[in-house]
UniProtKB/Swiss-Prot annotation:
CDD domains: iPGM (cd16010). Signal peptide: none annotated. Catalyzes the interconversion of 2-phosphoglycerate and 3-phosphoglycerate. Substrate binds at residues 124, 154-155, 192, 198, 268-271, 342. This is 2,3-bisphosphoglycerate-independent phosphoglycerate mutase.
Length: 520
């Protein structure tokens, strides 16, 4: 029956609220549609960072965390928080999966290779987790411990890796003293642009694989700090540092050998999958691997994908009665729609980590533009995305639609202020079209964001481009009937609010509150 009035949840990715107007692309942008909606309809600010979304206090939110909380209707304690707590409680050092991997390699006098994003960013990993893993390996008798450092510069300032590399070297010096017979060091450095690709650009991943497995890089240095200094001389920021092998005291590059154990220390899945598959897929065809060492163990810190044949140190905790599941149980239809960059977020993450569609669910994927960086096309494919979304609203097929506009976040990450302004203006135009379509067809809209980004484009301390997310609140605007906004709220309150507006009870698993109380 095609006469449904859609409730549309629009997620403007990276669209935070910041009172300070300097280097604020959202403030600078000409956004008449959102300005008018804010003046005319019930609205409020909601929290998207720290404990409000299950992260450590003061930790900025991100798209994965944001969409999990949005769809779950409850605060979901994130892997970051679980792992940090396990370290402080002393459980981490006894984690059976990690201990088994270390013990197997150590008993055969083989090396433990620890790798991942060496960063305090807390989005894909945290350096303190890596340092704890180094400690675990040494305490269990590992005599060869190597760190392969992926450098950030995206969730951290563009040139900030020196502090992290220094900390790692200090940790090794502490664990492996001069009187120690063991060997522990940073074995390689490379930018995340290569090692953490998620768009099937296998040539990038190949560079990271050859560096780690074969010790083959574009460059070779005696220390990680020398490698970083040389990269900066080449005008490469952290994210783009070329493959650099760090030699052992004997002057040779370090390789992964048969019997070695590999431990991937990223906790976020999306940018860890491709690199993991290089080691775990029996039918791997991303690129031709020159050498495939017979490693003893490959451990994922968390489960990156159900079909990756490797154990995870921290298994996923299942979520029941998330938004999509609850709608399906009540015979409601739903649509998930976004560009490639945020498609996983409105599907997999919004569904609480479930890949499969629910009954009555449909999905539309609009390809993101094929450009090197999105400042080259700040509008991305928002016009086509909006065409599809407006068509879906007009079709009358869907009770609920969730759409993500990636522009504020993806262009915000480039650090280009002018491009971010254009991105925000493009999104504003699209929001106007969607709101009109919803109103013309008897529907309603909730407009919000998953975290901030574009509202701060310059680091106030360093003066560098600010490419990371922020801890700022985000707007929530309800375009519909008369309603009273709550004084405060979080992302986990959005699903309960949508259900209230749709005239549905929320399941008991959803502990979030209603933020837009209808006035009878």
């Amino acid at each position: 029956m095609a006469n449904k009035k859609s409730t549309v949840l629009m997620i403007l990715d990276g669209w935070g609220y910041r009172e300070e107007t300097s280097s604020n692309a959202i403030h600078q942008a000409n956004t008449p549609v959102l300005d008018n909606l804010k003046a005319k309809y019930p609205n409020m600010l909601i929290d998207t960072s720290g404990m409000a979304v299950g992260l450590p206090e003061g930790q900025m939110g991100n798209s994965e965390v944001g969409h999990v909380n949005l769809g779950a209707g409850r605060v979901v304690y994130q892997d970051f928080t679980r792992i940090t707590k396990a370290i402080s409680d002393g459980d981490f050092i006894e984690n059976p999966t990690l201990c088994h991997a270390v013990d197997t390699a150590t008993s055969n006098n083989k090396a433990v290779h620890i790798f991942g994003l060496l960063s305090p960013g807390g989005v894909h990993s945290h350096e303190e987790h890596i340092f704890a893993m180094m400690e675990l390996a040494k305490k269990r008798g590992a005599q060869k411990v190597y760190l392969h450092a992926f450098l950030d510069g995206r969730d951290t300032p563009p040139r900030s890796a020196q502090a992290s590399l220094e900390k790692a070297q200090q940790k090794f010096s502490k664990l492996f003293t001069e009187t120690d017979t063991g060997e522990g060091q940073i074995a390689s450095v490379i930018g995340r642009y290569y090692a953490m690709d998620r768009d099937q650009r296998w040539d990038r991943v190949e560079a990271a694989y050859n560096l780690m497995v074969n010790g083959e890089g574009l460059h070779q240095y005696n220390s990680a700090l020398d490698a970083l200094a040389a990269a900066y001389e080449r005008n490469e920021n952290d994210e783009f540092v070329g493959a650099s092998a760090i030699t052992s005291p004997s002057g040779k590059a370090i390789k992964v050998n048969d019997g070695d154990a590999l431990i991937f220390m990223n906790f976020r899945a999306d940018r860890a999958r491709q690199f993991s598959r290089c080691f775990t897929d029996t039918n791997f065809n991303g690129f031709e691997r020159k050498r495939i060492p017979a490693i003893s163990n490959f451990v994922m810190l968390t489960q990156y994908a159900a079909d990756i044949d490797a154990p995870s140190a921290f298994a996923p905790t299942p979520l029941t009665n998330v938004m999509g599941e609850w709608l399906a149980k009540h015979n409601k239809t739903q649509l998930r729609i976004s560009e490639t960059e945020k498609y996983a977020h409105v599907t997999f993450f919004f569904s609480g980590g479930k890949e499969d569609m629910f009954t009555g669910e449909e999905r539309i994927l609009v390809p993101s533009p094929d450009v090197a960086t999105y400042d080259l096309q700040p509008e991305m494919n928002s016009t086509l995305l909006t065409d599809k979304l407006v068509g879906a609203i007009e079709s009358g097929k869907y009770d609920f639609i969730v759409c993500n506009y990636p522009n504020g976040d993806m262009v915000g990450h480039t650090g280009s202020f002018d491009a971010a302004v254009k991105a925000c203006e493009a999104v504003d135009t699209c929001v106007g079209r969607v709101v009109k379509a919803a109103q013309d067809n008897g529907g309603e809209c909730l407009i919000t964001a998953d975290h901030g980004n574009a509202e701060q484009m310059q680091d106030p301390v360093s003066g560098q481009a600010h490419t990371a997310h922020t801890c700022e609140p985000v707007p929530l605007i309800y375009v519909g009937r008369n309603a009273s906004p709550a004084a405060s709220g979080t992302l986990s309150d959005i699903s309960p609010s949508v259900l209230h507006l749709m005239g549905m009870e929320q399941p008991q698993e959803m502990t979030g509150s209603v933020l837009m109380q209808l006035i009878k």
